[in-house]
């Protein structure tokens, strides 16, 4: 009977469940099921369908229950950050959770800073100010006299809501609460002063847990539905990026990571928060990591731009798009991927064209020109953020590890290496699921520490290294990029 770990890994556009097994050769993983995750738009708001996500998790567990040679040791859930469910006094969900893409938080930080100074909020939390942080979502709901929040007894972040559906136990996991901007970066506990401003207390949240702690076991109902026994559900790093960073296959500590998916998150691991005027002005974030680490990082708009264009273009493969981009003229048009114009436009291609027109650049017309514009702009934006990160990091940065789905994008990896001027190591692409499984394995005693797990991943997975080329050309392009994005 193989000892296996069941990982639930949910992103903003898709989800999957995965079985991970440790063998003498390393880590083996197999997909159980994959499924889309859609935004639902109704009544002028955007929601997630948490019941549909739960149904897919149950389906995955049913599939595994039918495998005769597999015994699940534990289950772990990670998801995207900041969104949450309002739970009533009777334990039921009061409505589907709002999505962070919902427009109702426009201007929300400024409204909150009238009550608590921006500087004070950053000193407590060390978290990058973004409209959709849970802190601002909650304050928006409160200002709007939202009926679900008014009736809520508990608030559960998405991974904690799903573990509650499986176990009946309500917890608040540290990494997901940290990215919400509700945790004090130094004490690593919820910041009471912020909760008070929201009309909340710690009693409105589940039991506070850290990665590696047990949440509970599958309820009798879930056991009956799936055919499984009383399997424990473990709090992994509930925030997908924290799980992904745990899996970085680094052999020495002098690295930066780029978790590349719908969002790109670039940062370094530190032993404690770095909260200074400089990190605040550059809007860097200090998010909770595994094993007592802090992830000093910045959010960058990632493959979202291409995902939205691709959805509009219909059936076209990535290899086709990349070939078209490769054949297009270099550095013809550049954009700031983080411009508010690209947050959630009705037509992403049109938004890119508008940006280029407004900044007096050639307007991309073909698919290849659009994709080339996105990739070159991302690579140059990565350089800009890495330059800032070097000044903030307590250690030198000699290598950039690209992990997550974007690590499979060979063209973008090559251009990123050219832009940043240091080697780029690509992989693993399933970083989040691997980190999720790693934390479960550490809890089960299968491995002794994070460092040895990283070495094991380095041995188990084929990694590709990209070395910088054409750096003079990219240096010139970077100056142009800074000029274009500064003036827009």
Predicted regions and their residues:
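Stable alpha-helical structural segments in soluble proteins, enriched in small hydrophobic residues
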Residues: 56, 60-68, 373, 377, ...
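Active-site core segments that coordinate phosphate-bearing ligands/cofactors
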Residues: 7, 21, 113-125, 131, ...
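Glycine-rich beta-strand-to-loop/alpha-helix junction loops that act as flexible
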Residues: 78-82, 211-212, 260-263, 399-407
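N-terminal glycine/serine-rich phosphate-binding loop of ATP-dependent small-molecule kinases
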Residues: 1-95, 123, 223-233, 420-422, ...
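Structured loop/turn residues at beta-strand edges in well-structured enzyme cores
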Residues: 70, 92, 203, 253, ...
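Short beta-strand-loop/turn "lid" adjacent to the catalytic site in phosphate-handling enzymes
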Residues: 42, 62, 67-99, 128-132, ...
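Carbohydrate-associated surface elements
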Residues: 102
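Short glycine-rich phosphate-binding loop at a beta-alpha junction
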Residues: 70-79, 154, 207, 392-404
